Amino acid sequence: ENGYCLMVGASLEVAKAVEPALKALAPTPQTGWLHVGPIGSGHFTKMIHNGIEYGMMESFAEGLELLKGRKEYGIDIGKVTELWRHGSVVRSWLLDLTAEALKGDPELDEIAPFVADSGEGRWTAVEAIEQGIPAPVLTQALQVRFRSQEKSKGYGYKILSIMRNAFGGHVMKKKG
């Protein structure tokens, strides 16, 4: 429906050869794909993309958990996420997915606070270490996922889990 965001690492010759397929898979023939460089650069770019995704998702999870924590305000998290989808600086596809998921179960009572990691965040953290480039948001987001796989019972983990399931069909554990 929306096409793919394709990050291609290949020789110029190979990139030109597969360009028709890239254009067919992208949202438009002009957008949604890029020959980023030689072999390996596409995977590397996607890895960094996923590290950024981890940080963005963690920000939403933390913020929404803070809103939920002030019970005396009676804030409807679902209504807030729906509001933020329209004109807010934080509007995004991740927020769209979150708002839609919250319509069905705003308390996330049936969602276990467990967030899987599929490896890209680990690779991104290692890359930051190898390059000596501080990446505290990316590495902390990964650490939080590790913590969720243990004993934490936070609402924020449920938010992360529903987002990952909504955009990629990733595992979402149910309670019990």
Please annotate each region the language model reported.
Residues 1-6, 11:
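Rossmann-like NAD(P)(H) cofactor-binding subdomain of soluble oxidoreductases
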Residues 13-16, 20-23, 27-47, 57-64, ...:
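NAD(P)-dependent Rossmann-like dehydrogenase/reductase catalytic/cofactor-binding core
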Residues 53:
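Gly/Ser/Thr-rich loops at beta-strand to alpha-helix junctions
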